[in-house]
């Protein structure tokens, strides 16, 4: 018969379970809720932007900096592992900070744990917008992640990108390697794969997760759970409207059918335009002939253009 658990043992097991859950949840923190990507309002210019060490617009320093790792604005002496020891009960402002992250451009407090772990675990390490290719240092807004392909997006492109993200680079939902229906879709490659071709020797499937994409290794999703649409290609007369109003094959057949029933108005207009163009060309030819007759009797004497230049050179 097992021994009965004591109160201290129960507390220790519960503490270990909570710590395990916290460690697992840190890797799945929403990018919009991370302290280094928090929303900040400048004290001087009152413009809202991403959490930064210096204002992106006026370069001023904030009165209460926010730590990019733990998110605190006040360092308590009793409950922290401060690298810089401060004599008071707590410290705020520039007395609390210890470094600036090169990736997220935000302050990191002078706690030993934050200084040693933030640079390696910063979620904005390679944060470059997939649409405009701007990084954290190139614009003042916050960084977001696409909910479909999980690529980085800036504030300007996040809505437009996510509205057009679920579009396949194909005209059908068939697997790119065979002719069967693609049951799994990769939203980064914009391609579908069947069950057989999702098995890859390069990328291994983790337990409890969807199979990875055989091309890029990103986790695929079931096509039936997505609002996927295919790319539509238009050729020839299907491309759109034209200047004369005849767009597409429908308008072409409508014009033919109207000619059969005696509707010749369209052709009458063309004939009138052709006659007007012919009259303009004839008037232009007549005016050119009259101008040439005026200069035929004009005599300018011996000139270089008339061919007498070499005679004048010999005489001199």
UniProtKB/Swiss-Prot annotation:
Stretches the record annotates as Disordered: 1-24, 227-299
Gene Ontology, cellular component aspect: chromosome, centromeric region; ciliary basal body; cytosol; midbody; nucleolus; nucleoplasm
Entries under InterPro entries matching the protein: NOA36 (IPR010531)
Keywords: Centromere, Chromosome, Metal-binding, Nucleus, Phosphoprotein, Repeat, Zinc, Zinc-finger
Nuclear localization signal (motif): residue ranges: 3-11
Gene Ontology molecular function, alphabetical: zinc ion binding
Zinc finger map (C4-type): 42-58, 67-104, 129-149, 175-189
Subcellular location(s) of the protein: Nucleus; Nucleus, Nucleolus; Chromosome, Centromere
Bias-annotated ranges (Basic and acidic residues): 10-22
Modified-residue entries (Phosphoserine), positions: 287
Acidic residues compositional bias, start-end: 268-291
Family statement: Belongs to the NOA36 family.
Name recorded for this polypeptide: Zinc finger protein 330
Organism encoding this protein: Mus musculus (Mouse)
High-level lineage: Eukaryota, Metazoa, Chordata, Craniata, Vertebrata
């Amino acid at each position: 018969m097992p021994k009965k658990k004591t109160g201290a043992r129960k507390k220790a097991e519960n503490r270990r379970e909570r710590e395990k859950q916290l460690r697992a949840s840190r890797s799945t923190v929403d990018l919009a809720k991370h302290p280094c990507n928090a929303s900040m309002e400048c004290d001087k210019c009152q413009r809202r932007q991403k959490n930064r060490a210096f204002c992106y617009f006026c370069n001023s320093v904030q009165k209460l900096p926010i730590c990019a790792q733990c998110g605190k604005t006040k360092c308590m002496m009793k409950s922290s592992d401060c690298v810089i020891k401060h004599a008071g009960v707590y410290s705020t402002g520039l007395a609390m900070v210890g470094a600036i992250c090169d990736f997220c451009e935000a302050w990191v407090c002078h706690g030993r744990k934050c200084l040693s772990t933030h640079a390696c675990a910063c979620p904005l390490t390679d944060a470059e917008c997939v649409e405009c290719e701007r990084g954290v240092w190139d614009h003042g807004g916050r960084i977001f992640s696409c909910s479909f392909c999980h690529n980085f997006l800036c504030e300007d492109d996040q809505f437009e990108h996510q509205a057009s993200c679920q579009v396949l680079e194909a005209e059908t939902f068939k697997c790119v390697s065979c002719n069967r229906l693609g049951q799994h879709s990769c939203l980064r490659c914009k391609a579908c794969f069947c069950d057989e071709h999702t098995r890859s020797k390069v990328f291994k499937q983790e337990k409890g997760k969807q199979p990875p994409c055989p091309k890029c290794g990103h986790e695929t999703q079931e096509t039936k759970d997505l609002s996927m649409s295919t790319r539509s290609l238009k050729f020839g007369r299907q491309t759109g409207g034209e200047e004369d109003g005849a767009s597409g094959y429908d308008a072409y057949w409508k014009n033919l059918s109207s000619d059969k029933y005696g509707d010749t108005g369209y052709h009458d207009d063309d004939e009138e335009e052709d006659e007007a163009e012919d009259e303009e060309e004839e008037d232009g030819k007549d005016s050119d002939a009259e101008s040439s007759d005026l200069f035929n009797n004009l005599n300018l004497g011996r000139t270089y253009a008339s061919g007498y230049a070499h005679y004048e050179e010999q005489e001199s």
